[in-house]
């Protein structure tokens, strides 16, 4: 696996985080390379005046942030893992910290932006929210360039740039990536509420979903299956691990009203959605007793802290399909459960989580299954 990015007169050593053994994927892609080369070849830094800065949106592991270390820049991400990766790769490459501001996706953009570099995200609604925020701060002189894999740039993608920024065109493809150039036109664009709300009628819940929340348009059927098969017991400290909009943790709060529910996700928008949903749909006392944590799973949590962990594991990191996230979650759950504590998960049959749980816990049982999903229970033995 290549860790050295040699580009535009710089050599950067970049790692993906969290790090895993025998990593085969590098911490940048051809879209990063295309953006960096375009910036360098066109000497965009000469367009920066005093007190103006660069805005970077959706930098995955820090290639853009580290390359542009000499300039004042704000980096915006919805991913705790990405922000942590950027910090670690900054340290690895001895990049100065004083001219960098890292902020999450829920905050407004700075107003003194001259150059905007965007990595196209997987979720169109998230791109729209970022472009709507950008529309509020751009001027006719702002330079807006985006990059993404060819298969992620569609007419709908370009339509959003036309709507919120201005005249938009694309580059030729290189290494299966393409650039998007959008020339700002100052115009009135009606503000749109991009977060959506839908109901779970059976429970009389109204579910709020920010732009980048998993399954934001409907109730995830795997999550629904787990909600209907929660374990019976007198649980006091429960985790909804990888909580998304929080519906599994909410169901746990309804089933175990005296328990403290901890919602954990690496997406800032997910955690804020879960917080809003608890406050709107559960009794005040239960909502106030809940905890909401943006984190890389249970990393850094104390051992033997919880008696029930519920999980619908993701199998994507950025655009990469991986089972490493599930492995980490299961191992960390074993570490954080009390003796006789339970991990209950839902997953597609083909993911073969049962074998993983048996290897970690020494036991695993099928709680319920249907044609697509299986619910598994593993107990931490004394």
From Swiss-Prot:
Q: What PANTHER family does its record include?
A: RIBOSOMAL RNA LARGE SUBUNIT METHYLTRANSFERASE G (PTHR47816:SF5), RIBOSOMAL RNA SMALL SUBUNIT METHYLTRANSFERASE C (PTHR47816)
Q: Which Pfam families match?
A: MTS (PF05175)
Name the residues that span the membrane: none
Looking up InterPro entries in the UniProt record yields: DNA_methylase_N6_adenine_CS, rRNA_m2G-MeTrfase_RlmG, RsmC/RlmG, SAM-dependent_MTases_sf, Small_mtfrase_dom
Q: Which GO terms describe its molecular function?
A: 23S rRNA (guanine(1835)-N(2))-methyltransferase activity; nucleic acid binding
Provide the E.C. number(s) assigned to this enzyme: 2.1.1.174
The protein's location, in the record's own words, is: Cytoplasm
A Gene Ontology cellular-component term: cytoplasm
Provide this UniProt record's keywords sorted from A to Z.
Cytoplasm, Methyltransferase, rRNA processing, S-adenosyl-L-methionine, Transferase
Function field: Specifically methylates the guanine in position 1835 (m2G1835) of 23S rRNA.
**What is the protein named?**
Ribosomal RNA large subunit methyltransferase G
Coarse class of the protein's main subcellular location: cytoplasm
Q: Which SUPFAM superfamilies match?
A: S-adenosyl-L-methionine-dependent methyltransferases
Q: Which reaction does it catalyse?
A: guanosine(1835) in 23S rRNA + S-adenosyl-L-methionine = N(2)-methylguanosine(1835) in 23S rRNA + S-adenosyl-L-homocysteine + H(+)
């Amino acid at each position: 696996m290549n860790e050295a990015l040699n580009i535009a007169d710089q050599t950067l050593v970049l790692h993906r985080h969290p790090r895993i053994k025998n990593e085969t994927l590098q911490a940048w892609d051809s879209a990063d390379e295309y953006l960096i080369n375009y910036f360098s070849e066109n000497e965009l830094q000469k367009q920066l005046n005093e007190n103006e800065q660069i805005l970077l949106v959706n930098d995955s592991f820090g290639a853009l942030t580290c390359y542009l270390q000499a300039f004042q820049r704000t980096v915006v991400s919805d991913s705790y893992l990405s922000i942590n990766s950027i910090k670690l790769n900054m340290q690895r490459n001895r990049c100065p910290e004083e001219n960098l501001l890292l902020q999450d996706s829920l905050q407004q953009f700075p107003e003194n932006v001259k150059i905007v570099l965007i990595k196209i995200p997987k979720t169109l609604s998230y791109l729209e929210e970022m472009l709507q925020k950008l529309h509020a701060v751009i001027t006719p002189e702002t330079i807006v360039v985006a990059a993404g894999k060819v298969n992620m740039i569609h007419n709908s993608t370009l339509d959003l740039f036309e709507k919120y920024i201005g005249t938009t065109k694309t580059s030729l493809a290189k290494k299966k990536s393409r650039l998007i150039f959008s020339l700002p036109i100052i115009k009135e664009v009606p503000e749109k509420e991009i977060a959506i709300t839908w109901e779970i009628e059976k429970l009389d819940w109204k579910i709020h979903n920010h732009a980048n929340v998993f399954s934001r348009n409907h109730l995830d059927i795997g999550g629904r299956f787990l909600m209907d098969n929660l374990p019976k017991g007198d649980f006091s400290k429960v985790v909804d691990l990888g909580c998304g909009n929080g519906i599994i943790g909410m169901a746990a709060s309804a089933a175990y009203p005296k328990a403290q529910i901890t919602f954990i996700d690496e997406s800032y928008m997910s955690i804020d959605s879960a917080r809003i949903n608890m406050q709107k749909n559960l009794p005040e006392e239960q909502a106030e007793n809940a905890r909401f944590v943006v984190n890389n799973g249970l990393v850094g949590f104390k051992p033997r802290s919880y008696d029930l962990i519920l999980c619908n594991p993701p199998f994507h990191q950025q655009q990469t399909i991986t089972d490493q996230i599930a492995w980490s979650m299961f191992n960390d759950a074993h570490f954080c459960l009390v003796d006789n504590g339970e991990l209950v998960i839902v997953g597609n049959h083909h993911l073969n989580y049962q074998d993983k749980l048996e290897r970690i816990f020494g036991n695993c049982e099928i709680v319920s299954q249907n044609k697509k999903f299986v619910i598994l229970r593993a107990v931490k033995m004394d």
